[in-house]
Amino acid sequence: MEKRYIEFFDGYRQAYGLADFEHPEAYTDPDSGKKKPVYRWNFEKLTAQVYNSHLKGELSIGIQPCNENKEVKFGVIDIDPKEYDDFDKKFFIDIIQQYDLPLIPVESKSGGLHLCIFMNSFTDAKSVKSFLSNLLPLFKLNLIAKYFQSKQSSPGTRKQGT
């Protein structure tokens, strides 16, 4: 399974995002009781061992989709509603089915939704970003919604959004 996962979620391999639960600034949310990590870049190679640790639940990582050639094999629209109680995931699934979109909806850890698109080979990141941004109005999302960023600089200086 690890090899297949790496094929789907391949991207920038020189660093990866890390949810650091052991960081001194990590804390426990008093309302939910959940431990809140510090999110940071880990400037080490993204190896099969790191992927495997993520799949085993030992690490929580984030992968920069863009490789060094500004190409991607996957993209994600990350939907995090303000209120999770009334969040209608079926609305998004219905739109995907209605328009026969090449998206796979996956529930996120927080209870939101990731709308994932996968390519068989690395593809120009700007084209994929444009495609995903053009879908936002269908889902009644604005451009402030999060989706993957094209790699315009080092991972430590990326910009959120479009």
Language model features by range: what are they?
Residues 29-31, 37-38, 115-117, 156-158:
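Short, solvent-exposed polar/charged micro-motifs at secondary-structure junctions
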Residues 1-74, 82-92:
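DNA replication initiation on ssDNA origins
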Residues 60-89, 119-162:
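DNA replication initiation modules
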Residues 94-106:
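Active-site palm subdomain of RNA-directed nucleic acid polymerases
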Residues 105-114:
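Short, conserved phosphate-binding/catalytic loop or strand-edge motifs used
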